[in-house]
């Protein structure tokens, strides 16, 4: 399954949104909001060690391979953010208190405690908005192509 950056994501220059498969393929669109535990360059340090970043607090381990297989079986496109949900949770409303968690499960997230407004805004603009814009663009394109 080929991987590309979604055109809508390029508008923000984030490059943190991934599209795999044909945008107009199949009858479904597969989303995997918690696919990655990555903290991309430019987003600072969350104050967690590597062991914590491998835990469920940072992502849903195994979700991306399952989503890829489901997309392959259905011939559907797959869209996901290539950044940890600890930076910003793309599966929450942007104004939800837990969209940027100060703690997850039993673990404080030092890099999210007393987060400066400009840092949060950079996460929204670099991850959350491009991901949701990419989904909107994909669905709009599928509708125009008669694939929705």
What kind of feature is each model-predicted range?
Residues 2-148:
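N-terminal catalytic or cofactor-binding beta/alpha core of small enzyme domains
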């Amino acid at each position: 399954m080929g991987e590309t950056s979604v055109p809508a994501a390029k508008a923000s220059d984030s490059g943190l949104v991934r599209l795999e498969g044909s945008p107009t393929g199949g009858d479904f669109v597969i989303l995997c909001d918690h696919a990655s535990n990555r903290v991309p360059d430019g987003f600072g340090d969350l104050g967690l060690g590597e062991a914590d970043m491998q835990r469920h607090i940072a992502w849903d381990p195994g979700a991306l391979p399952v989503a890829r297989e489901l997309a392959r079986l259905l011939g559907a496109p797959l869209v996901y953010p290539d950044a940890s949900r600890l930076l910003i949770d793309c599966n929450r409303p942007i104004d939800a208190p837990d969209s940027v968690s100060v703690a997850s499960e039993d673990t404080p997230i030092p890099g999210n405690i007393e987060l400066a407004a400009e840092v949060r805004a950079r996460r929204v603009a670099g991850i959350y908005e491009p991901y949701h814009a990419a989904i909107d663009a994909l669905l709009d394109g599928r509708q125009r192509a008669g694939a929705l």
